[in-house]
Regions:
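Outer-membrane beta-barrel "beta-signal"
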Residues: 232-234, 240, 259-272
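Outer-membrane beta-barrel biogenesis signature
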Residues: 20-44
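Transmembrane beta-strands of outer-membrane beta-barrel proteins
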Residues: 43-49, 88-92, 110, 123-127, ...
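Transmembrane beta-barrel domains of outer membrane proteins
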Residues: 34, 75-79, 113-119, 130, ...
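Transmembrane beta-strands of outer-membrane beta-barrel pores
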Residues: 49-57, 94-100, 120-122, 131-137, ...
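Surface-exposed strand-loop-strand hairpins of Gram-negative outer-membrane beta-barrel proteins
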Residues: 51-75, 100
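Outer-membrane beta-barrel channels and translocator barrels
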Residues: 40, 81-85, 117-123, 154-160, ...
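Residues that define the transmembrane beta-barrel architecture of outer-membrane proteins
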Residues: 41, 66-72, 104-110, 143-149, ...
């Protein structure tokens, strides 16, 4: 999530930033997997907990401050099928980041959404709607409300012990805050190399591009580049621990929005 978190309090010279980019993180990538056919809809709870060190808590170009933060992320989902190839998902998701020292970096998101996915010859085509609430602080002050309309295409390629999972996503954000309205393009590649039934090497290189369309941010263009490497251990089929190192950089035609960030930490993923 932190991949594109924006400093929500900053609605000054250039308005609000891009908002939690890594909504398309490894968890979301897995969430794009095909829904098995069920005769009746099924409920699930999916989430993660991640204590993390960052060397740039406030996404600053010039005033870098290191800190530790805690990030829980929980979703409740209802999955079902309309046909053998057409599945749907209704979900509610809450996540936040709480810093040990740099409290200005605290932020939270709550959202509800729906996704419709067509499976065609191994490819997954999805249409997604999300009603999103971004908060300054840990659910302290509502910063803005958004309606995200998304389309994605994804597929898994398996070769022996290697799984490659490319995903492309296009989003337009409607928002009550003019500076938050924008187009967004995501391209990522999930990589998993199984060493044995329990251990894997994982990585999710990511590229994101933002084109802001309104308010003081009109004309602003950002690009985020992210690379990571991690080791994953599966306790069971639905509980795993991944420890990873992530490097991220943002380029922008607004110089003050450029930054670099290094993050290190474990993440516990679960699904029930």
């Amino acid at each position: 999530m932190r991949g594109s978190i924006v400093l929500l309090p900053v609605v000054g010279l250039f308005g609000a930033s891009a908002a939690w980019a890594a909504d398309v993180d490894l968890t979301e990538l897995k969430a794009s997997s095909p829904v098995p056919y069920y005769s009746a809809p099924s409920w699930s709870v999916v989430g993660s907990v991640a204590p993390t060190f960052t060397d740039n808590a406030l996404f600053s170009r010039d005033n870098r401050k290191s800190d530790f933060y805690y990030e829980p992320d929980v979703s409740v989902r209802l999955d079902g099928n309309l046909t053998n190839d057409l599945s749907y998902r209704l979900y509610a998701r809450a996540q936040y980041e709480a810093f040990a020292r740099e409290k200005d970096g605290n932020a939270a998101v709550a959202r509800v959404g729906a996704r419709l996915t067509e499976n065609w010859d191994g490819w997954r085509f999805s249409a997604i709607y999300e009603n999103r609430y971004d908060f300054d602080g840990v659910y302290r002050d509502l910063a803005f409300t958004s309606h995200d309309v998304m389309g994605s295409v994804a597929r898994d390629f398996r070769m022996n012990n290697v799984t490659l999972s490319p995903l492309l996503l296009v989003t337009y954000r409607f928002s009550d805050l003019a500076e938050a309205r924008r187009w967004r393009f995501d391209a990522l590649l999930g990589i998993e190399v199984k060493l044995d039934p329990k251990w894997s090497i994982v990585s999710t290189p990511l590229f994101e591009a933002f084109w802001f369309t309104d308010g003081l941010n009109r004309g602003r263009q950002d690009q985020i580049y992210s690379a990571d490497l991690g080791v994953k251990y599966n306790f069971t089929s639905n509980v795993s621990l991944t420890t990873s190192v992530v490097y991220e950089a943002r380029a922008s035609n607004v110089a003050v929005r450029r930054y670099r960030d290094l993050r290190i930490g474990p993440r516990l993923d679960f699904a029930f």
